[in-house]
Amino acid sequence: PKPSSAASDVYKRQLRNCVKFQSPDTYRVSFELPHQGMITGMGIPKGITLIVGGGYHGKSTLLKALELGVYDHVKGDGREFVITDPTAMKIRAEDGRSITNTDISMFINNLPNGKNTVSFDTEDASGSTSQAANVVEAMETDSSLFLIDEDTSATNFMIRDELMQRVVLRDQEPITPFIERIRELYERYGISSIIVAGSCGSYFHPADHIIQMDQYIPKDITTVAKDAAKDFPMVSLPEKKHPDPCFDRCFNAGNHLKKERKIKMKTLGKDAFSINKDTVDLRYVEQIADTEQTTALGYALLYTKLHLMDGKKDLCAVAD
């Protein structure tokens, strides 16, 4: 449908002061589109990419564009040319989320209460355990790109600096931070990472590519940042590689629903849906774009629970 005149005016005002995107020469790529001709833009290579810069210079805005680049866009303001690996997942902390039978031992081990982290369960996850679960669940669904913003991450999941490692020894800390696994995730599992960071320089060491957003313009500062990082100690890495996470979760989820006299799926806006009395909170699933997606997810989950989760198929087989 054609936007109203008022909406169109607001849209034009928003674009009036926009800064035209300019790609650094080192990341410039060109390709020809059918009926469109040649276009040129920034291509971020596979590997570990760090996006840095001062506050309000466009770091998170660039990441948000990449998050939604998994979708096709209506032609208009240029977002239709933002293309991201379709398996890309936005990873963040989700305090309070539930976790069921998930192997987070790649990041969380030796909890003081003795709780099993190979098959971890909780109704109220912390920031670090929730982000660990989000990473492992993305691996389980064969994601090949993680998108992470420092602002929405659990600090203790992302990094432990050298001083903290000296004071709190490795065998006293149950969390293996993401920085110690990021290189392994790429080299062993083929999973790239794009991370927005504004305050922690430790990721300069493992990064393959470092882009600085300067007044909304991306600049390649990889060489400069790598040279500067030589004067600072690297984070120590675990001595042993961790076994592959276990992805054999099987659920028989339909029995209790089949006993219900009436089954109702209700969409509660873009951020939640309910099946009978159970509510699924999607506030922190940032790649959901509209309410219709949430409705589709609700019906897909209902069908899956009634017809596919038979206790024999693992979640990957169910999803396929």
Placement of each model-derived feature along the sequence:
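Single conserved hydrophobic/aromatic residue that forms the stacking wall/gate
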Residues: 1-7, 11
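N-terminal pre-Walker A segment at the start of P-loop NTPase domains
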Residues: 12-38, 113
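Glycine-rich phosphate-binding P-loop
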Residues: 40-67
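AAA+/P-loop NTPase substrate/partner-engagement loops
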Residues: 69-108
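Flexible beta-alpha connector loops of hexameric P-loop NTPases
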Residues: 111-128, 160-175
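Conserved alpha-helical scaffold flanking the Walker A/P-loop in AAA+ ATPase domains
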Residues: 131-138
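Conserved P-loop NTPase nucleotide-binding/switch module
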Residues: 138-182, 186, 196-226
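Conserved NTP phosphate-binding and transfer environment spanning the P-loop NTPase/kinase superfamily
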Residues: 187-190, 196-320
